[in-house]
C-alpha cells in the first residue's frame, strides 16, 4: 500500500481505538435502516450546508440529513478496522466520507452551535459553559500588510490580553529576534473579529493596540487590547493537566483557513470548502508528545481535532471541564495535532504581569 494511503488507514484505526469502536460501529449515526433492508447498515450524517439564515439558540438538528453513508463506505470502514487489504477506492471513501464523520467540524452561528449528534452529546450538555468561551475567540485581521489580511486565531485570556501563536505574530510584528521592543510593522494594524460566523457578515472587531511579548520556549505571543465588550470575559487557563489528558473529549474553537499544502479532498469534505469562519472542531486529547518549536524540543499536548492553518492560535478546550487546556500551534496531517499546555505557561515570562487567571 502507498505510504500515504497506509497513514490514512492507520489514522482511521487509531481514531476508532480512541473512541472505543469496532467494525460494527460508525460515529455520528443519527438514523439507521434495519439490517434486513440490506447486507449492511446504512448511516446518515447531519447536513451542514452553509446558509445565510440565522440559527436559533439551541437549534435542533435539521430535519433532513445528507449524505447517506453507502454500503460500500460502511464496508470500507469495517475492512479498515479488521486490518483487511484496502483498494484505491477504499482510500477515497476513507478520506471523503469516513474521516469527516470521525472528526467533524461544526458551525458556530449566533454565538452558539446547533444540537450535535450523539457522539458529541457532551458538547450539548456543556453548552452553557462553552458559549462564553466562544465569544472570547476571534479571527486576527491585518490592515496595511502587503501580503496578508487574515492570519490566524486568538483569544482573550486577561483583562487587556490577547494570546495567539508566535509564528502568527511573526507575520506582522518586528523585533521578535532582536530583543528590542516589539512593534507592528510600519503601516500595519491588527484587530480581532470575535464573530466572522458562517452565513453572516456581522463582525465585532477589537483593536489590538500593540504587541507585548513572546515566549522564548513556546509558540505563544501576547497582544494588547485596551477595552473589551461587556459580553466578552477573559478565559482562565488550566493551571494543571486535566485528568482526561489521555483520551478525553476536547474541542478546538477557531477559524480554519484553506491550506494549499493539504489534501483538497479532506478540506472540501471535512470543512465543506467553507474557510475563515468560526468553527467548533471536536476530537480527543492524546497525552503529551515531544515536538520541535523555535529551535527547542517541547512536550506539547497531542490532539486529533480536525484543523487547518488558520487554526494557529486557537483555544483547545477540555469538554469535560470546559477549561482552556492548550493553544493549538501545529500538526501533521493524518497523524496528530499539537497544542501548548496552558499549565506550562504559569511561570512563563511572556505572561508575567498580565493578570491572567490559572485555575
Go through the PLM ranges and name each one.
Residues 117, 129-144, 148-151, 155-309, ...:
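Serine endopeptidase catalytic core focused on the charge-relay Asp
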Residues 2-25, 293-301, 308, 312, ...:
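C-terminal subregion of chymotrypsin/trypsin-like serine protease catalytic domains
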Residues 1-152, 279-284, 288-289:
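Protease-domain processing segments flanking chymotrypsin-fold serine proteases, especially trypsin-like
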Residues 125, 191-198, 348-359:
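Active-site-adjacent segment of 2-oxoglutarate/Fe(II) JmjC oxygenases
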Residues 94, 204-206, 358:
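Extended hydrophobic/Leu-rich segments
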Amino acid at each position: 500500500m502507498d505510504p500515504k494511503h497506509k497513514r490514512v488507514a492507520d489514522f482511521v484505526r487509531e481514531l476508532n481505538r480512541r473512541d472505543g469502536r469496532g467494525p460494527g460501529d460508525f460515529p455520528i449515526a443519527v438514523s439507521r435502516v434495519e439490517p434486513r433492508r440490506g447486507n449492511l447498515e446504512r448511516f446518515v450524517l447531519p447536513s451542514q450546508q452553509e446558509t445565510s439564515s440565522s440559527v436559533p439558540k439551541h437549534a435542533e438538528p435539521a430535519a433532513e440529513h445528507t449524505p447517506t453513508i453507502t454500503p460500500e463506505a460502511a464496508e470500507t470502514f469495517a475492512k479498515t478496522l479488521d486490518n483487511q487489504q484496502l483498494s484505491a477506492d477504499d482510500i477515497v471513501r476513507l478520506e471523503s466520507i469516513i474521516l469527516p464523520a470521525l472528526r467533524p467540524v461544526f458551525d458556530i452561528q449566533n454565538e452558539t452551535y446547533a444540537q450535535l449528534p450523539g457522539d458529541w452529546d457532551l458538547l450539548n450538555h456543556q453548552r452553557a459553559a462553552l458559549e462564553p468561551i466562544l465569544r472570547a475567540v476571534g479571527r486576527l485581521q491585518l490592515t496595511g500588510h502587503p501580503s496578508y489580511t487574515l492570519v490566524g486565531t486568538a483569544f482573550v485570556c486577561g483583562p487587556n490580553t490577547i494570546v495567539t501563536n508566535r509564528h502568527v505574530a511573526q507575520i506582522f510584528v518586528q523585533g521578535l529576534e532582536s530583543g528590542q521592543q516589539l512593534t507592528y510593522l510600519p503601516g500595519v494594524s491588527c484587530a480581532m473579529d470575535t464573530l466572522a460566523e458562517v452565513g453572516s457578515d456581522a463582525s465585532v472587531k477589537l483593536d489590538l493596540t500593540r504587541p507585548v511579548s513572546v515566549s522564548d520556549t513556546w509558540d505563544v505571543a501576547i497582544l494588547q487590547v485596551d477595552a473589551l465588550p461587556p459580553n466578552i470575559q477573559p478565559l482562565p487557563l488550566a493551571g494543571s493537566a486535566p485528568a482526561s489528558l489521555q483520551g478525553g473529549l476536547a474541542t478546538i474553537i477557531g477559524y480554519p483557513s484553506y491550506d494549499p499544502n493539504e489534501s483538497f479532498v479532506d478540506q472540501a469534505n471535512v470543512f465543506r470548502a467553507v474557510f475563515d469562519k468560526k468553527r467548533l472542531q471536536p476530537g480527543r486529547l492524546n497525552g503529551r508528545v515531544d515536538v520541535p518549536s523555535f529551535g527547542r524540543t517541547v512536550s506539547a499536548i497531542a490532539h486529533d481535532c480536525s484543523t487547518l492553518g488558520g487554526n494557529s492560535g486557537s483555544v483547545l478546550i477540555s469538554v469535560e471541564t470546559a477549561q482552556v487546556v492548550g493553544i493549538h500551534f501545529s500538526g501533521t496531517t493524518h497523524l496528530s495535532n499539537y497544542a501548548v499546555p496552558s499549565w506550562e505557561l504559569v511561570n512563563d515570562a511572556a505572561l508575567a504581569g498580565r493578570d491572567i487567571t490559572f485555575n
